[in-house]
Amino acid sequence: MLCIKSNAADFQAAHQVVNQVVEAFGKLDILVCNAGITRDTLLMRMSEQQWDDVLNVNLKSVFNYCHAASTQMMRQRSGSIIAMSSIVGVAGNAGQVNYAASKAGIIGLVKALSKEVGSRNIRVTAIAPGYILTDMTSSLPDTVREEMVKTIPMHRCGEAEEVAKVALFLASDLSSYVSGQVISVNGAMG
C-alpha cells in the first residue's frame, strides 16, 4: 500500500503522484478520479472564487490526473480510467451551476479522451451517481433529504458501496469493451 497526500488541482503534483505510483508498483492499471467539493448558491450570488474552487477540484483535477496517467498507460498499452461525475452533471440542479458545469465537463472529457486513447487499449468511463449517503448529503437538513428521496423512484438514497461496485466493474476485465460511457447509479432518477 502507498499513501500520498497531494493537491489534485495541481498539475505538477498529479504528475509526481503518478510517477511515485509507477516507481513503487512498476505500472499503473487503474485511475479513479474521485475528488469533489460543492460551493452551492444561486448563480447571481456566486463569487468567482466559489466557481473557481469547484472547477479546480472537480474538473481540473480530472484533467491533471488523466494527463499524467494516460502517458503511462499509453506506454503500457493498457489501463482503465474512471472519473466520478454526477446526476447533476447530466440533469443540472438549481443552486449548483458550478458543480453542474464541473460534472458535465467530466462527461465531455471522458467521451473525448476515450476516443484519443482507445486504440491503446485504455478504457475511459464515468460514473454519475444520484443522491448517495455521504458526508455531503448527511449535512443537509432532514427536510431537504426527505424531499430528495421523494424524487427517487426507488424511494431511498444510494450507498457509497453501490457506487464502489460499479467502479470495481469498470476497473475489471468484466468491462473490457466498455469505454466512453457514463454509468448512472441513481435509483432510476433519469
List each model region and its residues:
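Alpha-helical segment proximal to the catalytic Tyr-Lys
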Residues: 71, 115-119, 176
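C-terminal helical subdomain
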Residues: 126, 150-174, 178, 185-187
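Active-site loop-to-helix junction immediately N-terminal to the catalytic Tyr of the SDR YXXXK motif
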Residues: 46, 92-100, 112
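The beta1-alpha1 cofactor-binding region of Rossmann-like NAD(H)/NADP(H)-dependent oxidoreductases
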Residues: 5-16, 48, 161-162
